Amino acid sequence: MAALSAIMFQFAQAQDVFNEMSYSPGQTVFSLNAPVKGVVRIYDSGIAGKLLKTVKMRQDGVDKWTATVKGNLKGKFYTFDIGKGETPGVFAKAVGVNGRRGAIIDMSQTNPDHWTTDLRPVIKSPADLVIYEMHWRDYSVDESSGIVNKGKFLSLTEPKAIQHLKDLGINAVHILPSFDYASVDETRLDSAQYNWGYDPVNFNVPDGGYS
C-alpha cells in the first residue's frame, strides 16, 4: 500500500510538471520548471502578430515558477522566456505555426467522440502481425489514392484508406513520427518538402504539416 501511495504521489507530481498551461474561461495558469525566474508573453497570433502582454512569473517551489493571467485567453498564444530566447515550453500540447508559440486551448474539447472507449483489435500472438510502416504523407498523397484529405491525419479516417490496408492483408501499422518536427516549413505546405520526421520540436504536439 505504501508503494502504491508513493507511485500515485509521483504520478501527481509528474502531471503537475506536464501541465505548463491550464486554461479556464476565467483565467489561464502557466507553470514552468526552470533554474531561474522567467516571464510569460501572450500573443494574438501563433506567428508574428501582436504582443498583448508580458507577465512576470513568481516562485512556487524549487525551480518552479507560475503566473496566472485573468480573462478568457482561448485562441491566444504564449511563450516562456528565462533570458535565453522564447519557447512554448518542453511540455506544450498545442502550438502555432512551426511550433514557435504555445496555443491556449481547452484540452477538454480536443478528444474525438468515443476516444476513451476505443479498443484495438485483439491479436492472439505477435506472430500473427502483418506490419506496414507508414508515413502520413506518403500513404495518402498520390492523386490515384482517391483520398480527399491527402497527406493529412484525417486521411486515415476515410474508409478507402483503411480498406486498402485490409486488402493488402495488413493488420498492424507502424506510423513514422507524428509529433511536431522542424524540417517542414508549415508556411509553405504547397511547396515540395519532405522528411521522415525524426527532428522533433514539440514532442507532445501533432505536426502541423499533417493537420
Q: Which role does the model predict for each range below?
A:
Residues N33-G38, H135:
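Short proline/glycine-enriched turn/loop motifs at strand-loop junctions of beta-rich domains
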Residues S145-S155, D185-S211:
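Aromatic- and acidic-residue-enriched carbohydrate-binding clefts of CAZyme catalytic domains
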Residues P159-Y181:
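Catalytic domains of carbohydrate-active enzymes, especially glycoside hydrolases
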Residues Y132-M134, V173-I175, F203:
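Conserved hydrophobic/aromatic pocket- or pore-lining residues that grip, position, or stack substrates
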Residues S31-P35, G71, P177:
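Non-cytosolic beta-sheet module surface loops
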Residues M1-Q15:
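Bacterial Sec-dependent N-terminal signal peptides
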Residues F11-V29, Q59-E133, D138-G151:
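The feature marks proteins involved in alpha-glucan
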